[in-house]
Amino acid sequence: MDFVRKYFFVSIALGCTAIFLMLISCSKKSADPDTVITPAKTTTPPVTTTPVMVTLAGNGVNLQLSYYSGGNADLGFTLMKQQSKIKTVRIEIEPNQVNNAIRWIKEASDNGYTIICTYHKAAVLGSDQLQDLLDGANWWKTNYAALSASGKFYINLMNEWGSHSLSAANYAGYYNQAIAIVRTVYKGIIIIDIPGYGQETYVATNAVLGVSTGGVKITDTDIALSTHIYPGNYVGQHVNATGSFASGGNMVKADLDYLATSGRTCLVGEFGNGTNGTADWSGLVDYAKSKSWTILGWSWAGDGGDNIHPPMNMISPNFQAYKAGSIYPYTTSSYFEVVYNKL
C-alpha cells in the first residue's frame, strides 16, 4: 500500500506556493465517491498439479473381523500394543455386525489408536450399481450415532465400490449422492476408495477435477482418496487432464502422481503381497510413503487366503473367539514383517 506524505513549508514569502501544495496533497487523499480507488490486487491461485499433501493419520493395519466367531472375535490388541509402528487401525464392518463393531471401536479407542471404519459388503465388491453405494451411505446414516458413541473414527464410506470400467462421470455423480446422505450425520473427512478395487487412479482424480465428465465432479472437498496396492494392481483407464490417453497396464508410480493432482488427501488403504500379478507393490508402497501418505497394511488378521497364496495375516492363528476377561495368546506370523517393515 502507498502512503501519501504531506510536506508543509510555511513561509510568508512562499505563501502562494504553500497553498498550492496543500491543495494537491488534499486531492490525492480525497474520499470523493467519484474518485476511483484501486484496491489491493487479489488473484485466484492457478490450478496446480503439485498440491500440498496432508497426512491423514499414522500408518497402521487393517482388521477384518466379521467372518470369525460370528464377529465376536478377540482383536489381539495386547500383541498389537507391542508394535510401536502401528498407529492406525482400519476396521471393515459387514452390514450385520453393528453390535460387534461397537465393541471393536471401543477397544481400539481405549488402546489409543486412530480409527478408520469402512462399510464392507463382500457380496457387492467391485459393483458399479448406484443402489449398492446408497445402501452403504444409508447404513452410515442409520448406525453412525451408535458406532461413534464408542469412539471417534473416520468414515471410509464403502470398501472397493466401483469396477475397472466405471466412468469418472458416474463415479462423481454417484458419490455426490452418497456423500450427501452421510453428511446428514457426519461432518469429518470422508474416505472414498477409488474404483477398480482401489486401483483406477485416473478415474478418481478426473471425478474430483471434472475432467472428461461432462462437467460433473465430486463437490464435497472434505474427502480423502484411498488406493489399494497389491501385485495384481492394474490401471485400465489413463485419460489425464490434457485429454491424453494411454493403454492399461500395471500400476506404476506415475499413476500415484496423477492421484496426487486431485488436490485431496490421499492414502493407501490396503497393501500386501499375496495376489497374482507383477506390479511393483513394494516400490509403490514405498513411493506413497515418501509422499507422506498414510499406508495401512493388509492385514492384522481376518484374511482367508485364496487357495493359491497363504493368508495375509500378521498374527497367528487367525482371529479367535472373544472371551470377556481373557486375552488370547496370539503370536506374530511369518507374514508379519512383510507389512511391519513398510510402516
Q: What residues fall within each predicted segment?
A:
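N-terminal amphipathic alpha-helix/helix-capping segment at the start of soluble metabolic enzymes
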Residues: 53-55
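Bacterial Sec-dependent N-terminal signal peptides
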Residues: 19-50
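Sec-dependent bacterial lipoprotein signal peptides
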Residues: 1-25
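Extracellular glycoside hydrolase catalytic/binding regions
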Residues: 58-65, 70, 78, 134, ...
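Short, surface-exposed connector motifs at secondary-structure boundaries
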Residues: 84-88, 264-267
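An active-site-proximal structural segment forming one wall of the substrate-binding cleft
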Residues: 72-86, 93-120, 125-157, 169-183
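The conserved SAM/SAH-binding core of class I Rossmann-like methyltransferase domains
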Residues: 91, 117-118, 269, 298
